[in-house]
Structures are given as structure tokens and as C-alpha cells.
Amino acid sequence: MTLLNVSDLSHHYAHGGFSGKHQHQAVLNNVSLALKSGETVALLGRSGCGKSTLARLLVGLESPSQGNISWRGEPLAKLNRAQRKAFRRDIQMVFQDSISAVNPRKTVREILREPMRHLLSLKKAEQLARASEMLKAVDLDDSVLDKRPPQLSGGQLQRVCLARALAVEPKLLILDEAVSNLDLVLQAGVIRLLKKLQQQFGTACLFITHDLRLVERFCQRVMVMDNGQIVETQVVGDKLTFSSDAGRVLQNAVLPAFPVRRRTTEKV
């Protein structure tokens, strides 16, 4: 089943020039894509190529300048109030900048309960039980429930944001560089959790990343973005190779996971 369909999407931002006239900076140009239930897809590209802007459009935080976005066959622009609430529950996003994604005055307990209060019909006790369950799933415990964001490390806060998104059991989870910043052990744990969710609920995942290792370990398909356009799409197999210049540049930039000791024949 197709969850999300994007056709001919373009987007620009207006900014003032020296003449006082508004100039338009194109960020996305004729982007088309589709995501199916249970699918894991990567959107791969360098910083500044338009990946995060596309993500904001997909979750409805901004409206595109041109083109269409449909959720389960319904255009986002035509969703009624009830449908929009269901859409906000079904599609969740975890941002790269976790500090800006939470209220620093709220406790972790309040942060986790917030989407459940607004999007689910759960009693308070059920919300608290699910909050504990989600924390455990991302390798945190109840000791952080009464802490506030400034009291957490960056990795802990990122996992809190992931737990918050998972608490409403979304149909599609968009992760904007949200896993790449975790260390390899935590990253592996999160990936195991996401695989489990896919098996249980058919959750689809869209990884927005520049981390090719993450793509090769977890994704079934990868789209390469460059200068606001998707320049190629590849199925991820045993040997992932790219035909576009942008894809090859990213592939050549990958460093080994561990340092390689060079042998030397020089005598001291």
C-alpha cells in the first residue's frame, strides 16, 4: 500500500534584495517519490541539497510552492480536521537538532506524554506506562522522566525525541539525521527497534542522511538528492553502486569504520 506520494514538487523561499524587491531562491525542483507501508528508504545527499526542506513539506510543516503531496491517496491540502489529526498521528518526524525540538522547561515525562494527550485516546496511567515502555526501547530508564532537556546529554535527548515519535505508533517515521549522530552501539540498538516495529506494525521509515553506512545496513532503497532534485534511485543490495556524480562523491567520501594501520617498509 502506498502511504505517501509526491509529484512534481517544487519549493522556493523569498528574500529581499538590495533593490527592495523580493527574490526567489529555489530549494526543490520537480521532486517526485513514493513510499509504501513497511518500506525503509534513504534520502541521501550532502548538506544544503534540500533534504530537510523536503522533510518539512512531507509532514505538513510548510506548504509547497508547486506540486502535490498525498497521504493514502488524499492530497494534504484537502484533508479535513479529523483527517489532519490522523495524519499528524500517522507520520512522525525526529529532527537532527533535538534541542530545538523540545521545550526546555518540560520534563521528559511531559515531553513523552504530549503527543499521546493530543493524538491518542489513552488515560493518564496508560500514557505513563507507554512512556516507560518507549524509554526502555531506546535504552533509557525511568530515572530520566523527571529530568529536563538541559540535564540530558545530546545522545539521551535524541533518544527521548525518538521515543516520543514512536509513542503514537506512526505509520511513517521520518528521521532527519536523527540516528547518524548516535554512536555505533546505540545506532545498532535503534535499528533493531525499528526493524521490530516494521515487523509488528508495518511502520515505514525514511532516513534523511549523508551516512552511507546506515543506508547499506538498514535501507531497501536509496534516493540521491543533489541541488534540490532526486538525481537517481537505487535498490540497496550486496554491492551498492551509484551512477550519478553526486552519489559517487558521497560513496568515495565514506571512511572506514575503524582506523586502518598502514604498513611501512621504511627503516628508522
From Swiss-Prot:
EC top class, in one word? translocase
MF terms (GO), sorted A to Z: ABC-type nickel transporter activity; ATP binding; ATP hydrolysis activity; nickel cation binding
Pfam families on file: ABC_tran
User: Where does it live in the cell?
Assistant: Cell inner membrane
Query: What does the record give as EC number?
Result: 7.2.2.11
Recorded hits in SMART domains, A to Z, give:
AAA
Instruction: Quote the catalytic activity from the record.
Output: Ni(2+)(out) + ATP + H2O = Ni(2+)(in) + ADP + phosphate + H(+)
Nucleotide-binding listed as a keyword: yes
Q: Can the keyword Amino-acid biosynthesis be found in this entry's annotation?
A: no
Q: Name one GO cellular component term.
A: plasma membrane
Primary subcellular site in the record, as a coarse category: membrane
What keywords does the record list, in alphabetical order? ATP-binding, Cell inner membrane, Cell membrane, Ion transport, Membrane, Nickel, Nickel transport, Nucleotide-binding, Translocase, Transport
- Residue positions binding ATP: G45, R46, S47, G48, C49, G50, K51, S52
Domain ABC transporter: residue ranges: 4-252
Q: How does it sit in the membrane?
A: Peripheral membrane protein
Q: Which family does it belong to?
A: Belongs to the ABC transporter superfamily. Nickel importer (TC 3.A.1.5.3) family.
Assembly, in brief, is: The complex is composed of two ATP-binding proteins (NikD and NikE), two transmembrane proteins (NikB and NikC) and a solute-binding protein (NikA).
Q: What does this protein do?
A: Part of the ABC transporter complex NikABCDE involved in nickel import. Responsible for energy coupling to the transport system.
What's the protein here called? Nickel import ATP-binding protein NikE
Tell me the lineage of the source organism. Bacteria, Pseudomonadati, Pseudomonadota, Gammaproteobacteria, Enterobacterales
